[in-house]
Amino acid sequence: MSVALLWVVSPCDVSNGTGFLVSVREGNRIFDSSGRRNLACNERIKRGGGKQRWSFGSYLGGAQTGSGRKFSVRSAIVATPAGEMTMSSERMVYDVVLRQAALVKRQLRSTDELDVKKDIPIPGTLGLLSEAYDRCSEVCAEYAKTFYLGTMLMTPERRKAIWAIYVWCRRTDELVDGPNASHITPAALDRWEDRLEDVFSGRPFDMLDAALSDTVSKFPVDIQPFRDMIEGMRMDLRKSRYRNFDELYLYCYYVAGTVGLMSVPIMGIAPESKATTESVYNAALALGIANQLTNILRDVGEDARRGRVYLPQDELAQAGLSDEDIFAGRVTDKWRIFMKKQIQRARKFFDEAEKGVTELSAASRWPVLASLLLYRRILDEIEANDYNNFTKRAYVSKPKKLIALPIAYAKSLVPSTRT
């Protein structure tokens, strides 16, 4: 299953140690009662609580943000068939969003250009760092051509930082999707997470690590989304079915929504934006979820040939379908009806994401919008293929890509209007 790199990927480019916070907000502060507890271990809780269901259309109300803005609340607690109480994935992920937003609230609104920390270089290190970023640039140019061109529209510091994050995400994805994936064990992912801790502590292992280590020392990037992406890789090793959308949502957050949380501090929020920092992070998260859902819908046949089904099992059953129908690869009326609903949901996530793009800094809007428009068009191509995602791979043609770029540019010029 390929990972959607949000903010950064065009259709042709896509190829237990995570933390969950039980957080309490007070003004601009956030109190984290979790430390580094495992998100999976916190799925079962014994208390009640509100759920921030910011899901795509309207914010549902009762919760209060630091800005005084109210959101409606649905219950975050879900009963399992065994009668246990669990916390929904969206609530858990939203707690992570709150932490990221609190972390960068002051830094991102000071000036149009991010206030990057200027370190005093150790003699001899500048050349090595320059070489490290150059190598990240080469990796991006080779494996993510459209993304690479988009980054050239950014300021030099942002561009280098996004390259470093992209390369780390790609290396992480290749642990379970690359040529050596069959040899990867949970212990190997544990070692990769230990190495991540070293990167954030200023102890890089190699040149590519050094670029990321430099990036996180300059920008207000938190380690948690990186840990969560590694947890998504663990999930891919042990899980090939998802009982419902709540489980699938958590997987999509791990492998793609995390990239949005990593990227917002680099992209920057427009100083004139009246939107809350939380809402911009929500939009980034929504784009990651939308991209990964699109990957899943595009790659149904490819994943089935690997024995994997990344579709909600309960929704398949409600549509009168099963894994056997997917492995058979027949496009039936039942399949078309099922796919229409899945595509509709993915589009709602794209719509929510698009609302937040105008809140980004001016230099970041165009590449982000281009990525969004191109990825959303994959859904159109699935429809054009009569929902045959078993033997036909939906893709956006070069002429359609060229048409999308000026549209994205025009949209990027629209100033922020949200309050």
UniProtKB/Swiss-Prot annotation:
GO MF, one annotated term: squalene synthase [NAD(P)H] activity
This protein's record includes keyword DNA-binding: no
EC number(s) given by UniProt: 2.5.1.32
pH dependence statement: Optimum pH is 7.6.
Annotated compartments: Plastid, Chromoplast stroma
Location of the transit peptide in the chain: 1-74
Tissue: Expressed in fruits, at lower levels in leaves.
GO cellular component terms attached to this protein's record: chromoplast stroma
Signal peptide: none
A GO BP entry: carotenoid biosynthetic process
Uppermost EC category: transferase
Further remarks about this protein from its record: While the color of orange fruits is due either to the accumulation of beta-carotene, or due to only the accumulation of red and yellow carotenoids, all peppers studied have a wild type PSY1 enzyme.
Record's subunit section: Monomer.
Protein name: Bifunctional 15-cis-phytoene synthase, chromoplastic
Lineage: Eukaryota, Viridiplantae, Streptophyta, Embryophyta, Tracheophyta
Underlying gene: PSY1
